[in-house]
Amino acid sequence: MKRLNKLVLGIIFLFLVISITAGCGIGKEAKIKKSFEKTLSMYPIKNLEDLYDKEGYRDDEFDKNDKGTWIIGSEMATQNKGEALKVKGMVLYMNRNTKTTKGYYYVNAIKNDKDGRPQENEKRYPVKMVDNKIIPTKEIKDKNIKKEIENFKFFVQYGNFKDLSKYKDGDISYNPEVPSYSAKYQLTNDDYNVKQLRKRYDIPTNKAPKLLLKGTGNLKGSSVGYKDIEFTFVEKKEENIYFSDGLIFKPSEDK
């Protein structure tokens, strides 16, 4: 009888541990989603200049007279097996104090040397934004690059996360010491954002991607750290296909 009671108590204890662990996971997932929703609920912003009138999270890092700067970045990376990782993207710095935007378009080819160390070959093309149009600030002789800049759209302009709450059972990671956190979800090719990416980029795989929400800093909000979203289509040794995007609010360098 005593053995039976011990067995029952052991099962109950194990059940409680599993329940508490699962509950903590669900709680962290909800907090991570809530942290990202503050920014993702703004998507899509078709006219980027609307960000001049939008304020992000402010903390003690901001001067009281500083309206802050939005930093936008989107990039597509593709690596066929045995080849270099080819990356194309753009970063803009939107200063709300001066209502001016500058940044750069970049092209990179990353390949490991004989010792396995990654060697980059990044080229940057400075740009500015006027009347919601992105314009090179220096002459570009390469017509293809010039056209890519003129036609470039940030994910924030067409992405939509109204169904973020429907993403369930994600792989959750949280490290309170850094702090860092992430949530990963398996998507389908019918997902709205996946369709939008395939519409705009030549993605050489039919595999549906995983959506990764990752960040550092206080979950409740912080100007220190970052928040990124990533759509990972392929992740293998010497073979990768992913799209990453970020929209963060930081103190301005020139007040």
From Swiss-Prot:
**What's the protein here called?**
Uncharacterized lipoprotein SAOUHSC_00054
The compartments listed are: Cell membrane
What UniProt keywords apply to this chain's record, in alphabetical order? Cell membrane, Lipoprotein, Membrane, Palmitate, Signal
Q: Where is the lipid attached (N-palmitoyl cysteine)?
A: 24
- One Pfam annotation reads DUF576
Q: Which family does it belong to?
A: Belongs to the staphylococcal tandem lipoprotein family.
Q: Which residues form the signal peptide?
A: 1-23
Tell me what organism the protein belongs to.
Staphylococcus aureus (strain NCTC 8325 / PS 47)
Its topology with respect to the membrane?
Lipid-anchor
Supply the PROSITE patterns for this chain.
PROKAR_LIPOPROTEIN
Lipoprotein keyword on record? yes
User: Known InterPro entries for this protein?
Assistant: Csa (IPR007595), Csa_sf (IPR038641)
Lipidation (S-diacylglycerol cysteine) occurs at 24
Q: What is its main location?
A: membrane
Extract one GO cellular component term from the record. Answer: plasma membrane
